[in-house]
Amino acid sequence: MWPNASSLGPCFRPMNITLEERRLIASPWFAASFCLVGLASNLLALSVLMGARQGSSQSRSSFLTFLCGLVLTDFMGLLVTGAIVVTQHFVLFEWQAVDPGCSLCHFMGVIMVFFGLCPLLLGAAMASERFLGITRPFSRPATASQRRAWTTVGLVWASALALGLLPLLGVGHYTVQYPGSWCFLTLGTDPGDVAFGLLFALLGSISVGMSFLLNTISVATLCHVYHGQATAQQRPRDCEVEMMVQLMGIMVVASICWMPLLVFIAQTVLQSPPAMSPTGQLSRLTERQLLIYLRVATWNQILDPWVYILFRRAVIQRFYPRLSTRSRSLSLQPQLTRRSTIH
């Protein structure tokens, strides 16, 4: 693939880094602590979710199903990728010696793309579900909401996996990245690398943008109903407000964690002159920027469960007591029905 890499597998690029430099960059204790905190956070969120699903309404049950899918994805992402990265940081093995055929690198590249895109796609799916639930409450059969939610989660997983497998089918490449402890898509000039990098960045960015648009409309609708001429019995339920607060939190976390990396990938593959030399080497600045943005993106897997844990109704009521004292409504449907009748 690269002129001076004929004796190596297709996942190896030139990378000038000493063992001492790798030790300074890749702290095994930090990586292990990071993974343990993330795994514990997601397990805690799963236990809270299991309790919340008992006796929940149809709309809330569907939303909690999406949340379960999101937390499970984050947990498995930390578990699988963390096992590889933490082992590499402790042992400091040479990837060429352990994985000359690039099988491990290809596997890690697939799961990095899969577990990276899934939270963004699930966020967009959750935003769509809440948008329809708030603005079109009669457009879907309530009895099928939970089954439909799991089907949607499965489709998201399948779509992200299909995208992650593209480099194994010849569209782009997965290569070992600086400082030699992880694999990801290649920020090169090859048409396949450019196409795959742009596809990954655009799909992630569109998911974030779609979440922002639909969540904004949903929040505006809730505010209109809440502050309109509706009686107390026609105002949004506490759970409607709770779900939107959690969804907005998930969207903000995903935007802060992932948008820098997505923008950086798009800018780098489109950069002129190219960021990667003909020999397959990136500048040290570009390599370090990619590593920093990737580390920021991985915080999404730790922060997601805490958005649900901290933004539950019981916690919100501590800071906003009015939420527990005001009259609880039956649903949004009376007000929305009246509006649709008028129009």
From Swiss-Prot:
One Pfam family this sequence matches: 7tm_1
Keyword terms, alphabetized: Cell membrane, Disulfide bond, G-protein coupled receptor, Glycoprotein, Membrane, Phosphoprotein, Receptor, Transducer, Transmembrane, Transmembrane helix
TM helices/strands, residue ranges: 30-52, 67-87, 107-128, 150-172, 194-219, 247-270, 290-311
Ranges facing Cytoplasmic side: 53-66, 129-149, 220-246, 312-343
Membrane topology: Multi-pass membrane protein
Glycosylation sites recorded in the entry for this protein: N4, N16
Main location: membrane
Compartments, record wording: Cell membrane
Gene Ontology annotations of biological process type: adenylate cyclase-activating G protein-coupled receptor signaling pathway; inflammatory response; positive regulation of blood pressure; positive regulation of cytosolic calcium ion concentration; positive regulation of vasoconstriction
Entry GO MF terms: thromboxane receptor activity
Extracellular compartment segments: 1-29, 88-106, 173-193, 271-289
Disulfide bridge map: C105-C183
Annotated GO CC locations: plasma membrane
Phosphoserine carried by residues: S329, S331
Assembly with partners or alone: Interacts with RPGRIP1L. Interacts with RACK1; the interaction regulates TBXA2R cell surface expression.
PANTHER family, sorted: G-PROTEIN COUPLED RECEPTOR FAMILY 1 MEMBER, THROMBOXANE A2 RECEPTOR
Similarity comment: Belongs to the G-protein coupled receptor 1 family.
Reported function: Receptor for thromboxane A2 (TXA2), a potent stimulator of platelet aggregation. The activity of this receptor is mediated by a G-protein that activates a phosphatidylinositol-calcium second messenger system. In the kidney, the binding of TXA2 to glomerular TP receptors causes intense vasoconstriction. Activates phospholipase C and adenylyl cyclase.
Protein name (record): Thromboxane A2 receptor
Gene: TBXA2R
